[in-house]
């Protein structure tokens, strides 16, 4: 089997980063819910420590988001360059790969808009 083309690699990279970004947002929501639950619970002598740990985890997750955004932007740029070079080379990649690549560009741009 032939190795995947640069277009396929760039496409899967964008899709992976979009999924990664979505999972970080889901993790943020879960951490915020755990913090609210800890704030409302009383009587636990370990609550202060748990609260500190959850807040630290929340801040660490928030700190990762700008990096993921930058990676998505860079991967989108590379994918768009691969689409363009494929067009200039007379369409070496299959039509299906090009369609998937364009869909990935749309998903990546949508994810960037949602982050903003």
Regions of interest found by a model, annotated:
Residues 48-56, 95-102:
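Short, charged, amphipathic alpha-helical segments
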Residues 10, 14-17, 21-38, 61, ...:
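Non-transmembrane amphipathic alpha-helical segments
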Residues 1-13:
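Short, charge-rich amphipathic alpha-helices with coiled-coil/heptad character
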Residues 35-54:
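Short, Lys/Glu-rich amphipathic helical modules
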Residues 92, 97-116:
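Domain-scale macromolecular recognition modules
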Residues 68-97:
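Long amphipathic alpha-helical coiled-coil segments
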Residues 56-76, 112-115:
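Amphipathic alpha-helical coiled-coil segments
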């Amino acid at each position: 089997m032939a190795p995947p083309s640069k277009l396929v690699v760039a496409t899967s990279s964008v899709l992976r980063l979009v999924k990664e970004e979505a999972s970080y947002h889901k993790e943020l929501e879960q951490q915020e819910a755990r913090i609210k639950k800890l704030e409302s619970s009383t009587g636990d002598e370990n609550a202060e420590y748990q609260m500190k740990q959850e807040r630290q985890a929340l801040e660490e997750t928030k700190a990762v988001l700008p990096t993921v955004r930058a990676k998505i932007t860079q991967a989108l740029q590379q994918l768009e360059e691969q689409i363009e070079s494929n067009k200039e080379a007379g369409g070496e990649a299959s039509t299906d790969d090009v369609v998937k690549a364009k869909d990935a560009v749309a998903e990546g741009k949508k994810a960037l808009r949602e982050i903003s």
